Amino acid sequence: MDSVNNLCRHYEEKVRPCIDLIDTLRALGVEQDLALPAIAVIGDQSSGKSSVLEALSGVALPRGSGIVTRCPLVLKLRKLKEGEEWRGKVSYDDIEVELSDPSEVEEAINKGQNFIAGVGLGISDKLISLDVSSPNVPDLTLIDLPGITRVAVGNQPADIGRQIKRLIKTYIQKQETINLVVVPSNVDIATTEALSMAQEVDPEGDRTIGVLTKPDLVDRGAEGKVLDVMRNLVYPLKKGYMIVKCRGQQDIQEQLSLTEAFQKEQVFFKDHSYFSILLEDGKATVPCLAERLTEELTSHICKSLPLLEDQINSSHQSASEELQKYGADIPEDDRTRMSFLVNKISAFNRNIMNLIQAQETVSEGDSRLFTKLRNEFLAWDDHIEEYFKKDSPEVQSKMKEFENQYRGRELPGFVDYKAFESIIKKRVKALEESAVNMLRRVTKMVQTAFVKILSNDFGDFLNLCCTAKSKIKEIRLNQEKEAENLIRLHFQMEQIVYCQDQVYKETLKTIREKEAEKEKTKALINPATFQNNSQFPQKGLTTTEMTQHLKAYYQECRRNIGRQIPLIIQYFILKTFGEEIEKMMLQLLQDTSKCSWFLEEQSDTREKKKFLKRRLLRLDEARQKLAKFSD
């Protein structure tokens, strides 16, 4: 008697709290965030899976042909003390149905399945929970999954087999799940779909238990094959196999009670010439299976708790950080709302100013806006330099035209100023569209950066975001137009060929000295060739002089355009653009009647925040439960 009492105390002190903890976490919805230790029951249709669960739970579950289990069924069994009354409860969605008699279970589950999956043969991944408290059940929680079917029949969806497999796989592939695979003893174990699926997700068989059913239907002479399976010689599983004999259809029709069925099962294995050894080894009968599963689940839970605690803490931190990204909740009263809006707009304006002043924070691998603009301006300067270095066919044509057609009394070497001026004007004018194109590229770049800040700061407030984005577009068009007008005006001014005398003289002198130095170098390298070329024809003198003057003016022109165009763009497209946005945002605050409208959150943002808050709430509760369990 003392040993029995000690065993009861062991269950009450160790086993039940472990299982209750996981059941509580599952009831809180923690399984939405991470996997919980569980035993999932799978089997092909007509494998005897329902009979095994009935034998363990002591209640009649839905039976019939075709798909009977159409939703995952969480079967929570709680052992009561002798003399306590049976009680049950079926829960799904927000519905709870209290049961006072085991005979009410089947109808309640059918109603739940019809409610969730619809009347018919469809399936759903939503859970139905069945709580059974009785002196005749073990402390155990199982998840019953739909039976595997290969072919759709009747009104079943054509892809019903694929749907069921996908549903089963979501459970059995989790490392936290022990897979209880139910297989009839009278079939070739290698052909069963359930065992094949279990092997696919658990190749080493580390977390799979096999349960053989219907041993009374094994053909005479085939008993040895069943024993080979039980001895792990055919399809090895590290957790091995159990074998049970549940009520058959005739037993049910004859209303054989579960107690009588257990007695009948005990006699069957005890008297069987082959299978009696399995009873002696504790591998046969439903009571042995129940004890084994309780031990497996309890051990599995205890091993999983440290990792589970880490996962809950990690999920809590992740959800907290994600919720923080959405910012503070919007205040309820108007005065505080206005203050909230002012703070949001002030923060946005600060971010815009940081961007303009090249003080913004950028992610790793990205670069600041001003760095991107500087690269554009450097490319512009390089473009001008390369452009002026190249001899335009038009320049050569103009000089030939002057030599051959229009040269008058000028002595060799004198430059026609009108020809010089004409060449300069056309060459400089050709750069105008390149400058305007750069303006448009930079404008797009700057607007993109401004809108990115806008989306980051106001992305959750659709009305405020759309209003500000529209205003930014207006400001962009105005600033771009003003900048373009000034750029085109600058190029019009560049049509006046002018340079300070002293500057021009110095530049021309430098160019001539460089070219003279080149000629000296050539003479040193090849004196004979230099002697022949030194007798300049009159055409060569004029062309050389013209080229030198063009180079001198190009240098000064390049300095002007290379500096002035980027300054114009920076002023209108960066500095003034940002300042106008800042003014515009402050003007939005003037209309206080729109404060609430501006702060209306997008529906998906509201839902996401609600979701994260619910998640944090259940994770907080889960942490409390774990802490209490550990004490």
Curated annotation (Swiss-Prot):
Residues 333-601 are annotated as: Stalk. The keyword Transferase does not apply. It comes from the Eukaryota. InterPro entries: Dynamin, Dynamin_GTPase, Dynamin_GTPase_CS, Dynamin_N, Dynamin_stalk, G_DYNAMIN_dom, GED, GED_dom. Residues 520-522 are annotated as: Critical for lipid-binding. The keyword Transferase does not apply. Its main location: cytoplasm. Residues 307-332 are annotated as: Bundle signaling element (BSE). Residues 245-248 are annotated as: G5 motif. SUPFAM superfamilies: P-loop containing nucleoside triphosphate hydrolases (SSF52540). One of its GO terms (molecular function) is GTPase activity. GO terms for cellular component: endoplasmic reticulum membrane; nucleus; perinuclear region of cytoplasm. Gene3D superfamilies: Dynamin, middle domain, P-loop containing nucleotide triphosphate hydrolases. Changing S47C: No effect on viral infection. Residues 332-499 are annotated as: Middle domain. GO terms for biological process: defense response to virus; innate immune response; response to virus. Residues 543-631 form the GED domain. Belongs to the TRAFAC class dynamin-like GTPase superfamily. Dynamin/Fzo/YdjA family. Interferon-induced dynamin-like GTPase with antiviral activity against influenza A virus, (IAV), influenza B virus (IBV) and Thogoto virus (THOV). Inhibits FLUAV by interfering with the process of primary transcription, probably by affecting the viral polymerase function. This is Interferon-induced GTP-binding protein Mx1. The gene is Mx1.
